[in-house]
């Protein structure tokens, strides 16, 4: 996680936000610059990096692992000989779709545009990459707040370490200076990876939500006792008001649904717990604060479990 590699000072605990409604984060500062996050994404969280001093050497670690994955590991994991070029192209296509809910058939179409391979074969390659802890899917949260046709149940695709994705794309840290849109996907992938680690540590679940009305949460962090946070992930502070508005709308949808569900006393519908916290995790924020509406703005440079 970014806390373990030093990009986060760890002064804000996600667990405490959920456990203590009086937990005060206001005024906590982050010293992490956007350029540091560019570098961290390309470097990755590989333990081998910790022993190196030169940044250029640190960036080579992820590239080495990337080559090893498609040249050797994808076959060695279960003893099945797999085509390195198919594996390389699949990693490239997955990287182009990181932190999205792109359909697998579309990801596979990228590969099949240049490689003579079937969907069944590519699916077995994905299984191998999952076993190797290279890629992982985040399940969708599917409460009955909307009709079944409105809720999108597609999984969100992420890399366990986004540095592998960036190695597949051939991207260096300075590239993001002129492409913050791409970094938005990379940053979301990075945050989701950290949240997954925190969820596993605290016996929690990490989900996401999207529906056809535009309602969404980049992450739904759900504790074992039912408490949960709705989380939006943004790079720039200029996107915070939009994220705040989206989270508040989500909370209001849950509230209105519950009000309606309770009106019919003889045949009540499910009532959903309201979120314990609404959180915007921001790459470029230098200070944590709580908005007037109660949304927590957390710089990634402060977050820990």
Predicted regions and their residues:
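Conserved small helical "lid"/interfacial subdomain of P-loop NTPases
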Residues: 1-19
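Switch/connector loops and helix/strand junctions flanking conserved nucleotide-binding motifs
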Residues: 3-7, 167, 240-242, 287-292
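Short mixed-charge
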Residues: 16-26, 252-277
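Amphipathic alpha-helical "lid/sensor" segments that cap RecA-like P-loop NTPase cores
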Residues: 20-68
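Accessory nucleic acid-recognition modules appended to NTPase machines
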Residues: 50-227
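Structural motif
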Residues: 227-229, 277
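Active-site ExK catalytic segment of metal-dependent nucleases
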Residues: 229-239, 250
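Domain-level recognition of nuclease-like catalytic cores that cleave nucleotide substrates
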Residues: 276-277, 281-305
